[in-house]
Amino acid sequence: MRVVLKLGTSVLTAGTDRLHRPRLVDLLRGIAEVRAAGHEVVLVTSGAVLAGWEALGFPPRERTLAEKQLLAAVGQGRLMHLYASIADLYGMPVAQVLLTADDFRDRTRYLNARTTLEGCLTRGVLPIINENDTVAVEQIKVGDNDTLSAFVANLVEADLLVILTDAPGLYTADPRIDPTATLIPVVERVTPEVWALAGGAGSHRGTGGMHTKLQAAEIATRAGTPVVIAPGDAENALARIVRGEALGTRFLAHGSRLEARKRWILAEIATGRLLLDEGAVRAVRERGGSLLPAGITTVHGPFERGHTVRLLAPDGSEVARGLTRYRADDLKRIAGRHSRDIEAVLGFTYGPEAVHRDDLVRL
């Protein structure tokens, strides 16, 4: 089994204001146990900003982008050194892999990243992945490591994504304020009702909350990878989950795995939205057809030709994602028009489809 494990800042600190070394030892021991049982593990970790904050003597936190990037630059090396020194105790070589959203958006970089990670796994190296915060401005940020872990699970075609956090899983209500709240052991699909249970932001030490974890679960399960959100302080959590023990909340995968190219389309961050009429929704969802300009009612950009866009039904629900053949400004001019009018309106044509069916992932 190939497993992607995501560790958030709240897990790495064990409730303190600094990286908790004993917790890291426990977590890496668990990874070593799972690897010894014949499984492959890819680790997605937070903690670089916190490690930098710790290294600089806990200065007041302004939370500006410049400060976060400074702290990440100071802390990333220290975080990796800590991981490497502990992993050495268990005979695990490690590799640092820093990614940005552009590495998932660009097909060549996406394939290069996958080749690197496959090489690590083939040679028994533990890849340790973080977002490259020192260079990732807002436009090229994945945004949080929960989402990053889902993209990585997609990238390596993982059999399971495990997100360890400071919560036991997804509850029917906030257990901190509602004593009747109960843990939800299995979620078949991330519905609007499930989203309503997500609550607000995460801890003051990290950037993620249950909302971002649900987003990660939705991305991964759509691509065919099941997800488990479980407590990071549970003893031997990773090994227990891999063995199939019920721990936390398990999100079931949607059908079979997507082919590699469609995994890439789903992994790319959608930069725009196309609102469709009912006829176009039926053509895409029920008949597996392409999206024609005639079926588009509204275009929300900006985006360029070849970018991933979300296709939405009139009620706002997402029907599919796909690669657009036209940039936003051009689609706005031909939306609602017959395909035969494209060249007359634009002065050129890239074909009759706004999004070809071969470039669509139906959801």
From Swiss-Prot:
<feature type="domain" description="PUA">
    <location>
        <begin position="271"/>
        <end position="349"/>
    </location>
</feature>
<feature type="binding site">
    <location>
        <position position="133"/>
    </location>
    <ligand>
        <name>substrate</name>
    </ligand>
</feature>
<dbReference type="InterPro" id="IPR015947">
    <property type="entry name" value="PUA-like_sf"/>
</dbReference>
<feature type="binding site">
    <location>
        <position position="46"/>
    </location>
    <ligand>
        <name>substrate</name>
    </ligand>
</feature>
<dbReference type="InterPro" id="IPR005715">
    <property type="entry name" value="Glu_5kinase/COase_Synthase"/>
</dbReference>
<comment type="function">
    <text>Catalyzes the transfer of a phosphate group to glutamate to form L-glutamate 5-phosphate.</text>
</comment>
<dbReference type="GO" id="GO:0003723">
    <property type="term" value="F:RNA binding"/>
</dbReference>
<feature type="binding site">
    <location>
        <position position="6"/>
    </location>
    <ligand>
        <name>ATP</name>
    </ligand>
</feature>
<keyword id="KW-0028">Amino-acid biosynthesis</keyword>
<dbReference type="InterPro" id="IPR041739">
    <property type="entry name" value="G5K_ProB"/>
</dbReference>
<keyword id="KW-0641">Proline biosynthesis</keyword>
<dbReference type="Pfam" id="PF00696">
    <property type="entry name" value="AA_kinase"/>
</dbReference>
<protein>
    <recommendedName>
        <fullName>Glutamate 5-kinase</fullName>
        <ecNumber>2.7.2.11</ecNumber>
    </recommendedName>
</protein>
<dbReference type="InterPro" id="IPR001057">
    <property type="entry name" value="Glu/AcGlu_kinase"/>
</dbReference>
<dbReference type="InterPro" id="IPR019797">
    <property type="entry name" value="Glutamate_5-kinase_CS"/>
</dbReference>
<feature type="binding site">
    <location>
        <begin position="165"/>
        <end position="166"/>
    </location>
    <ligand>
        <name>ATP</name>
    </ligand>
</feature>
<dbReference type="GO" id="GO:0055129">
    <property type="term" value="P:L-proline biosynthetic process"/>
</dbReference>
<dbReference type="InterPro" id="IPR011529">
    <property type="entry name" value="Glu_5kinase"/>
</dbReference>
<feature type="binding site">
    <location>
        <position position="145"/>
    </location>
    <ligand>
        <name>substrate</name>
    </ligand>
</feature>
<dbReference type="GO" id="GO:0004349">
    <property type="term" value="F:glutamate 5-kinase activity"/>
</dbReference>
<dbReference type="Pfam" id="PF01472">
    <property type="entry name" value="PUA"/>
</dbReference>
<dbReference type="GO" id="GO:0005829">
    <property type="term" value="C:cytosol"/>
</dbReference>
<dbReference type="InterPro" id="IPR001048">
    <property type="entry name" value="Asp/Glu/Uridylate_kinase"/>
</dbReference>
<feature type="binding site">
    <location>
        <begin position="207"/>
        <end position="213"/>
    </location>
    <ligand>
        <name>ATP</name>
    </ligand>
</feature>
<comment type="similarity">
    <text>Belongs to the glutamate 5-kinase family.</text>
</comment>
<dbReference type="GO" id="GO:0005524">
    <property type="term" value="F:ATP binding"/>
</dbReference>
<comment type="pathway">
    <text>Amino-acid biosynthesis; L-proline biosynthesis; L-glutamate 5-semialdehyde from L-glutamate: step 1/2.</text>
</comment>
<dbReference type="InterPro" id="IPR002478">
    <property type="entry name" value="PUA"/>
</dbReference>
<keyword id="KW-0418">Kinase</keyword>
<keyword id="KW-0067">ATP-binding</keyword>
<keyword id="KW-0963">Cytoplasm</keyword>
<keyword id="KW-0547">Nucleotide-binding</keyword>
<dbReference type="InterPro" id="IPR036393">
    <property type="entry name" value="AceGlu_kinase-like_sf"/>
</dbReference>
<dbReference type="InterPro" id="IPR036974">
    <property type="entry name" value="PUA_sf"/>
</dbReference>
<keyword id="KW-0808">Transferase</keyword>
